[in-house]
Amino acid sequence: MQKQKPLLTINNKTEQYRIKFEEINKILITLLDTPIIKTMHIGSTSIDGALTSGIIDILVVVKSLHAMTTLDEKRLNLQNFYRLHHPYQKKCVYAQFSNLQSLTEVVRLHIVEEDGKKLNQYLTGQSILIEQIQAFNQYKKALNHEISVKEYENKKSEWFKRKLSV
């Protein structure tokens, strides 16, 4: 199987991404007995002119990660969101795919606790992204796009970690 490579384009569809975010937000907020406190559209699809892979990133704030029960996971599965099992610390990640054969992500939910450090890191990261979008675009352009999506995501994470540690 050939590894997926990130396909990046300049975001000139911010309004379309915002509409899709609003649709997903409505679904999330109306889930029965939802533990969700608030949501926020984050990442490059929320910023005009950002170089983006087109994945809509949504920050989902809950009282506690323990509030995300098996029942909530099943409800998210019914909306075609599937939990990504990675060694994430203090967050859960769910993805929605364009299809389940290629596993091309179209939406990613980043679920964090209301009073946790992760929430502040995401909010600070979004502010940095908005302020330094040209530098981030240059960084993305400079990456070797023969790398896999996983390697690409790791490089993006490294950029944010460097910026957050300053």
Regions found by a protein language model. Give the residues of each.
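Catalytic core of pol beta-like nucleotidyltransferases
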Residues: 1-53, 62-70, 77-166
